[in-house]
């Protein structure tokens, strides 16, 4: 949907500089670039997880500067609502925001904590519960996708294919070769980023014309 050489953004990340946010910016860009090699991305840090006013203002500015696609790492539907008013498409974050912007949302990531809580409570009941880090995946339904909307059938089919590939482990966005935007090789040809790499990712991939804050 994004036009050649148009901006695809903005990113509207959260309160602290986190690998989670950097990783999602990179994923968004790699996905967009896979279907449009000329895509550009602009990044705006609003320094909050939830502030509808700031989120809407950032989206407004970016759209005025030429963004034709909006994505976010904040939690309110304000960016999508702003996009809808401007006739721009975008993606929701953390929950299905379709009811707030039915003409703008293409899909949204959905955080579904139920499987995690059920397994942990069951572990307490069984006496098998242990502390530790947890990394949930789409095949556990901890991360879900909202229905694909406002897109033609062929695009919907392509999106479903990618979603299925992620769930069954056949598609992984961070598969080398991948360089960062300084030209340093981060993943060799065919190498798949492991959890350690993903959770220490503090670089933008090649093609993103921006600096990670503080670097």
Residue ranges with predicted function:
Residues 1-215:
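A residue-level marker of the well-folded mature domains of exported/periplasmic proteins
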């Amino acid at each position: 949907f994004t036009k050649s050489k148009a901006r695809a953004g903005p990113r509207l990340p959260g309160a602290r500089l986190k690998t989670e946010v950097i990783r999602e910016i990179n994923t968004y860009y790699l996905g967009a670039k896979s279907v449009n090699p000329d895509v550009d991305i602009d990044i705006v840090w609003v320094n909050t997880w939830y502030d509808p006013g700031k989120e809407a203002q950032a989206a407004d500015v970016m759209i005025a500067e030429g963004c034709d696609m909006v994505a976010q790492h904040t939690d309110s539907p304000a960016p999508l609502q702003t996009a809808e008013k401007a006739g721009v498409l975008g993606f929701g974050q953390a929950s299905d925001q379709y009811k707030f912007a039915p003409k703008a949302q293409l899909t949204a990531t959905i955080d579904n904590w139920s499987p995690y809580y059920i397994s942990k409570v069951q572990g307490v009941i069984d006496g098998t519960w242990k502390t530790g880090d947890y990394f949930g995946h789409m095949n556990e339904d901890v991360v879900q996708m909202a229905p694909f909307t406002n897109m033609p059938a062929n695009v919907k089919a392509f999106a479903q294919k990618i979603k299925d590939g992620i769930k069954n482990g056949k598609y992984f966005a961070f598969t080398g070769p991948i360089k960062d935007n300084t030209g340093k090789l981060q993943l060799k040809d065919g190498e798949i980023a492991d959890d350690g790499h993903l959770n220490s990712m503090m670089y933008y991939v090649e093609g993103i014309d921006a600096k990670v804050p503080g670097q």
